[in-house]
């Protein structure tokens, strides 16, 4: 998926079920000039990603009605969506979660709570890295 030109605002989809965390991420990203789309669960996430075609997805793994891994699996099955970079942001730190994340080639995993500096560095890196 081609990146938007430097003159246009990049869109980040925040998929987070906790309304406080979702609003916090939205505020921090908007303050940096990003356009922010929001989803609170797996079903709405897939609808929003199809509609918005974001430049990057921030994905919480602990979602109601299908976890973040389900969202990832569905995204990767749709060619035009599979190239969208995904950053995992999660409070999970168990070995099974780490194993699944590693197997999917997802890095870095941003541990909650994530500082603005770490968040923005990860976003910039992901947006500058060519797909594939």
Language model segments and positions:
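Non-catalytic signal-transmission and effector/linker regions of two-component phosphorelay proteins
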Residues: 1-13, 117-132
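Conserved acidic carboxylate
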Residues: 16
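Two-component/phosphorelay signaling modules centered on CheY-like receiver
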Residues: 19-37, 104, 116
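Acidic catalytic/metal-coordinating carboxylates
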Residues: 41, 67-73
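Active-site beta3 strand of CheY-like receiver
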Residues: 52-58, 63
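The feature encodes the CheY-like receiver
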Residues: 64, 82, 94, 113
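Alpha4 helix (beta4-alpha4-beta5 surface) of REC/receiver domains from two-component response regulators
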Residues: 70, 93-110, 121
């Amino acid at each position: 998926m081609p990146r938007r030109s430097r003159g246009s605002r990049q869109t980040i989809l925040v998929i987070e079920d906790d309304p406080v965390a979702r609003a916090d991420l939205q505020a921090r990203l908007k303050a940096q000039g990003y356009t922010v789309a929001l989803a609170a669960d797996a079903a709405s996430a897939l609808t929003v990603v199809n509609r918005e075609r974001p430049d990057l997805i921030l994905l919480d793994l602990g979602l109601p009605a299908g976890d973040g891994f389900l969202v990832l699996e569905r995204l990767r099955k749709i060619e035009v969506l599979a190239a969208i970079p995904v950053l995992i942001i999660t409070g999970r730190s168990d070995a099974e979660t780490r194993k699944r994340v590693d197997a999917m080639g997802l890095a870095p995993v941003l541990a909650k709570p994530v500082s603005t500096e770490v968040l923005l560095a990860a976003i910039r890196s992901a947006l500058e890295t060519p797909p594939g």
